[in-house]
Amino acid sequence: MKSTLAHKFRGMTFGLIGISILAFTAAACSDTENQSSTPTYENGVVVTAHPEASKVGLEVLQNGGNAVDAAVAVKFALAVVYPNAGNLGGGGFMVYRSKDGETAGLDFREKAPGLAHRDMYLDENGDPIAELSLRGQLSAGVPGAVDGMVKAHAKYGSADWATLLEPAIALAQNGFPLTERQANELNRRKESFEKYNPNGTALLKSEGEWAAGDLLIQEELANTLIHIRDKGRAGFYEGEVADLIVAEMQRGIGIMSLEDLKNYEAQWRDPVIGTYRGHKVISMSPPSSGGVGLLALLKSVEAFPLSQWGFQSDSTIRVMVEAERRVYADRAAHLGDPDFYQVPQATLIDSTYNATRMHSMDFSKASLSDEIFAGEIAGPESEETTHYSIVDKDGNAVSITTTINDSYGSHVVVDGAGFLLNDEMDDFSAKPGSPNLYGLLGGEANAIQPGKRMLSAMTPTIVEKDGELLMVVGTPGGSTIITSVFQVILNVLDFGMDMQQAVDAPRFHHQWKPEHISPENAAIDSLTRLSLEASGYEIINRGNIGRVDAILVLPNGRKQGGADPRGDDVALGY
């Protein structure tokens, strides 16, 4: 039976306690299209974490650029207008699908410097040293963002490289108005910025505190972008900018060298591909755990009638939580950099394997995580990542998730170059087999080694239906990335939501350990909560989960953008 959407999530206030969610039954995409108030676009759509970045991407598309051209321009624009996660000094992953169905994955994840070693964050007693992998020059991995964009443009871009850098340069030179959220974030970190940047940084206001509407001008960052515009890859990994990075290392106790920078290479990798209810799901392969985790979750729940049970019904939540519990246990033990560790990818996304894992589920009571798997779990990834989705008029699609790890990364701005360094080294297991700074165990597959890429949860994803593009989706959110993308896909395919409704809908998270379910802002209704708690599930509320930016292609070919209201995200199209 088909029904209309019973609750408009766009109007809900995140942070409100006691949200009551009505159940949904399945609705066909054509019904969703007819009933939806979400705008649709005939040609291209860009959805990013910042209005200025979305404008940049849309302008590229309108001027004849393709999805990859727009993605490159957006990436550099985000480095200016979204400094807490958009970056030059970080890395990420891209999943690409051409209008003809060709797919590719690009790994521009950061790497450990050549002088890195597995015990580099431990004291003389072998215990992790607080903040050493989180702040300062030693926490930085070798950045991959610039090389990633160079490689993406060289293979799939059509517009002039220099032209794609101009909007970001202008935003850095002329400044852009801070949102209230951004002003508050910068003010909260003032003391840390002063500590790690004794020579000052554009992120520190000369007098008083930042306020919404203040212009953030970043002249040093503009100069770095000009180097990249004029010299491409060499403008960052060699010459003046590279020298400034190494000089910054020497101001602290950093170990990144000119050789590390010169030798960095982003890698083209085959995306991981699977199916869910007749749809083809294309996502990022390791060293991202996202694609494998997402496909394993989808396979784990595929046999259950979720659409009949309804959105966030008691049975739906039980199945999803038990799937998440099992998949995150496997993620902890079996995933790492495939250049250093043999990842059993085929097994982890196999239908029979995941169905068998679900056989131990008991609908009458919660599973105990220690009884599901007693393996080791890697440290969590920060939630300060960013994602953007782009589809051009021809149907080429790009899904990119990028990060510098924690909000504002290492808090170190490269003196003279104006960009923040990542603190991605914290995504390694500082001490395999012992609790890390978060009280979680670290896996051997993710131990620190020179030149190795740290494990990630980033999950840039593209979905097809009957050989045609259907959805482009991804999110920041650290360990919640995989479950957020999982839920948004189910919201569309099982619960008949349109793209904006699927993004707006409240989310929950479970990651094997710790034991509890984490609904955002009391998202699970009170009756369902009581039923789950009576069965032994522990539920602890938390704040917002993820900031999903996604695009849905409707049966008539028009496109919907879904921009997450949890942030300043904006969807634009034409």
Q: Where are these predicted regions, by residue range?
A:
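Bacterial N-terminal signal peptides that target proteins for export
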Residues: 2-17
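Short beta-strand scaffold segments in enzyme catalytic cores
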Residues: 86-87, 91-98, 386-390, 460-462, ...
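Internal maturation/activation junctions in enzymes
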Residues: 303-403, 416-417, 424, 432-433
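C-terminal motif of bacterial Sec signal peptides marking the signal peptidase cleavage site
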Residues: 25-28
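Extended C-terminal subregions enriched in glycine
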Residues: 431, 452, 485, 494-543
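Active-site rim segments in enzyme catalytic domains, especially the processed small/beta chain
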Residues: 80-105, 255-257, 397-465, 495, ...
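Noncatalytic scaffold domains of N-terminal-nucleophile
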Residues: 31-55, 59, 67-232, 236-238, ...
